[in-house]
Amino acid sequence: MFLEKIVQVRREKVRQAKNKIPFWEMRKMAEEQVSHRLPLSLRQALLRENAKGKVGVIAEIKKASPSKGVLREQLDPEEVAQVYAKSGAAAISVLTEEDYFLGSPEYLKAVRAVVSLPILRKDFILDPYQIYEAKVLGADAVLLITSLLASVELKEMIKITEGLGMEALVEAHSLEEVEKALTAGARLIGINNRDLRTFATNIDVSLKLAPVLKEAGVVMVSESGIRSKEDIKALMTAGYHGILIGEALVRAPDPGKALEVLLA
């Protein structure tokens, strides 16, 4: 399966990264960052928008995807991040996976230098090394995908993330995965409307799982396949605090205008 291929490539990239900067050194650098910069809370950023009667938008910087290919030929991460910030984004998501999404850890570093919004590292995180690296790059939150991690790994990675002053956006696609996320201690859960095995999207996935998340009292985010104001209204009515949008923005001629239209 394609997902397995991405995971295999990612594991190899992490192995190569550890050869350049050993695990202990990356961890030390990350721990030093804790006292150097106060992290920004993704959860609080979303809830602040809700207090104004709006949904919190995590606007994504994404050059390509395995299913759609290149989404934006000329992508300047710093410019797009600044446009998102001016256009009402609550937070910025930066894809750092290089081979299939044409992202880069350097994108995150560059974005950190130009915006004061919370930044989410979006990647296939399989090893604590990547969490320490995210901290060093300037991330405030990391995406942890439930289906890629054993329960014990997920719990440990949430603990490491929070120990560094960051937050974990724990991604799920089914009731079973939501329960796994809750058991691991997730307080911020993202429902991916995209099936990572087929890449098909349907916001009904988020709508069906909303009651379980509401009952658990977590901050709720809906990810992928959100294209219209009607979609946003349905998700807000269901109780979602935030939405993650990438493709609909980066494919637009003017990403900032596209975001403003969705939020109007």
Swiss-Prot record:
Gene3D superfamilies: Aldolase class I. GO terms for biological process: L-tryptophan biosynthetic process. Pathway: Amino-acid biosynthesis; L-tryptophan biosynthesis; L-tryptophan from chorismate: step 4/5. It catalyses: 1-(2-carboxyphenylamino)-1-deoxy-D-ribulose 5-phosphate + H(+) = (1S,2R)-1-C-(indol-3-yl)glycerol 3-phosphate + CO2 + H2O. This is Indole-3-glycerol phosphate synthase. GO terms for molecular function: indole-3-glycerol-phosphate synthase activity; phosphoribosylanthranilate isomerase activity. It comes from Carboxydothermus hydrogenoformans (strain ATCC BAA-161 / DSM 6008 / Z-2901). Its EC number is 4.1.1.48. Belongs to the TrpC family. Keywords: Amino-acid biosynthesis, Aromatic amino acid biosynthesis, Decarboxylase, Lyase, Tryptophan biosynthesis. The lineage of its organism: Bacteria, Bacillati, Bacillota, Clostridia, Thermoanaerobacterales. CDD domains: IGPS (cd00331).
